[in-house]
Amino acid sequence: MLQVSVLRTRPGFSLEASFAAPTPGIIALFGRSGSGKTTLVNVISGLSVADAGDIRLDGEVLTDTRAGVAVPVERRRIGYVFQDARLFPHLNVTGNLRYGEKRARAAPQVIGFDEVVTLLGLTQFLQRRPRELSGGERQRVALGRALLSQPRLLLLDEPLASLDLARREEVLPYLEALRDHLAIPMVYVSHQFDEVLRLATHVVLLEAGRVLAQGPVNEVSLRPELQSIVGPDLVGAVLEGVVTRLDPDNGSADLAVGRGTLQVSLRDVPVGSRVRLQLLARDVILATQPVQGLSVRNALASTVTAISNDDYGAVLVRLDVGGETVLARITQNALQALKLRPGDAVWTLVKAVSTRGHAFRLASGA
């Protein structure tokens, strides 16, 4: 468990943040630029000092201002990966990785050199200098160096922010591999919700130095505070299920979710795999009667559980779909025409193609 409750005040900005998240896994600090994410990870690392508060990792006190405890940075066993790789230009990849080993000192070994090289796909780059690597390759080396310091916590401060889309997609599978194969908890800073959706096991929403919400990804995805950060087009429920049938020719799969089945757009994921899926509220259609003759592949019996206005003049309808919660975003006119009320039975319609790019494979332990 990572437990944080800290106050840090500087001219023009005040951080007052508290959260508790299970470990291992990836704890995402999500919010707009300037919300306090980097300040918070710097306080956790010990690079910045809290004015008040405490930080505990798996029961061990790292900071307790009342008791006068402030474990020095070098003794916290916390790895840190920045937006830029910060590799030593005069060393090759092997030398940069070995530097991480030197920082480990007498720390218990969490992961070895060969395992890091294999896990991050660095074998072919070991003799290259940083200038000979792409941005994504440099970030993988930075990850490896941090891992070889044998950390008990890894801080990742927007490690993909300086990369273009292609390089970002190159690095993401390696971050998934770290999450799925290592027992090292990670704090991942991002202002891109698709990264959070793909990687995180726990989310902390930050705004203006305050925690707006926290919890598992599927719970936070339903919180109204999220919409204020991501806007209306990215609001939607996050579901997890198991692939029960795969149709590689058509690029689709059946996903067992709750007590029902969804047909989704998904390739190259074996039957039996666990998948995390975001259903965007804008892509969900509601009907009060069964509908025939449509290309929509999913028509699910549902119950309206709540109706609320959003901040953009539309209506968010919360639905129980086979024991899972789904959101639909409709207009005020549609609400009046359908005469919806909590408790009403409706049909929830979702195009399989609308899930393309919003479904990600999870390891069994994620």
Can you name each region flagged by the protein language model?
Residues 62-79, 103:
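ABC ATPase NBD coupling module
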Residues 148-152:
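A short, proline-enriched helix->beta-strand linker immediately N-terminal to the Walker B motif
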Residues 261-308, 325, 329-366:
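Glycine/charge-rich catalytic "coupling/switch" loops of P-loop NTPases
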Residues 60-65, 108-125, 176-177:
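Conserved ABC ATPase "signature" region
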Residues 129-133, 137:
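Conserved ABC ATPase signature
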Residues 154-158:
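Catalytic Walker B motif of ABC-type/P-loop ATPase nucleotide-binding domains
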Residues 180, 190-260:
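Internal alpha/beta loop-helix hairpins
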